[in-house]
């Protein structure tokens, strides 16, 4: 009887280890993808800023600090401490919402260069990967909204009348918000991935 129990325990441990390994692999792919998007966003934003006059940069930065990104309507951890306390499923769901919120506005960032044309397809790949991770972690005992029910406010602030520098401001804000959101997703996925290694130090 004891040998049967031992064999079953070994089998269960093997299945559990395999699930963790699969999740780690999916997390590694997702983190690599969002890191690429974040670096891409940094480069595009830097290139755009370099094309502006000093006064234009100052004015646009001042306006942006007073404005909001679409992601500000998505409830997410307010600081690194809350991020570390959040569950894996919660971090994945928020990341999914952030990525999904860029499906439409990312079209405004496409075109004009090979770098910009990478954005939409890479966002789609990242969204698919995060959805797979959410499904793999759905057995977690937490009542968190399904990804299909996540609601996002319209990207209205980018399509309002912005005055004479409308095009400049819209591009500046889109690139700045895209960079900000990809950094958020990178942070959340990195912390969630770290949780799979109990001995790891997940301090931000």
From Swiss-Prot:
Q: Which family does it belong to?
A: Belongs to the somatotropin/prolactin family.
Q: Which GO terms describe its molecular function?
A: growth hormone activity; growth hormone receptor binding; metal ion binding
**Stated name of the protein:** Somatotropin
N-terminal signal peptide: 1-17
Disulfide bonds, paired cysteine numbers: 69-177, 194-202
What's a Pfam family this protein contains?
Hormone_1
Q: Where in the cell is it found?
A: Secreted
Q: Which Gene3D superfamilies match?
A: 1.20.1250.10
Q: Which organism is it from?
A: Oreochromis mossambicus (Mozambique tilapia)
User: Do you know which PROSITE patterns this protein is assigned to?
Assistant: SOMATOTROPIN_1 (PS00266), SOMATOTROPIN_2 (PS00338)
Query: Does the keyword field hold Ribosomal protein?
Result: no
Q: Name one GO cellular component term.
A: extracellular space
Sites of the modification Pyrrolidone carboxylic acid? 18
Q: What is its main location?
A: secreted
Mind listing the GO biological process terms from this record?
A: animal organ development; growth hormone receptor signaling pathway; positive regulation of growth; positive regulation of receptor signaling pathway via JAK-STAT; response to nutrient levels
Top-level division of the source organism's lineage = Eukaryota
């Amino acid at each position: 009887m004891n040998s049967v129990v031992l064999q079953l325990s070994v089998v269960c441990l093997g299945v559990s280890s395999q699930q963790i390994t699969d999740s780690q692999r999916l997390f590694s792919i997702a983190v690599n993808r969002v890191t690429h998007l974040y670096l891409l966003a940094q480069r595009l934003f830097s290139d755009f800023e370099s094309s502006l006059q000093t006064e234009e940069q100052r004015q646009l930065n001042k306006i942006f600090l007073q404005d909001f990104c679409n992601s500000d309507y998505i409830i997410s951890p307010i600081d690194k401490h809350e991020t570390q306390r959040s569950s894996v499923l919660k971090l994945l769901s928020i990341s999914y919402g952030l990525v999904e919120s860029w499906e439409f506005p990312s079209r405004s960032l496409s075109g004009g260069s090979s770098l910009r044309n990478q954005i939409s397809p890479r966002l789609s790949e990242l969204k698919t990967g995060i959805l797979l991770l959410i499904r793999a972690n759905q057995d977690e005992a937490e009542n968190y909204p399904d990804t299909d029910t996540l609601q996002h406010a319209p990207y209205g602030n980018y399509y309002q009348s912005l005055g004479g520098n409308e095009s400049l401001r819209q591009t500046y804000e889109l690139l700045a918000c895209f960079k900000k959101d990809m950094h958020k997703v990178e942070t959340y996925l990195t912390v969630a991935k770290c949780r799979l290694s109990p001995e790891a130090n997940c301090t931000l």
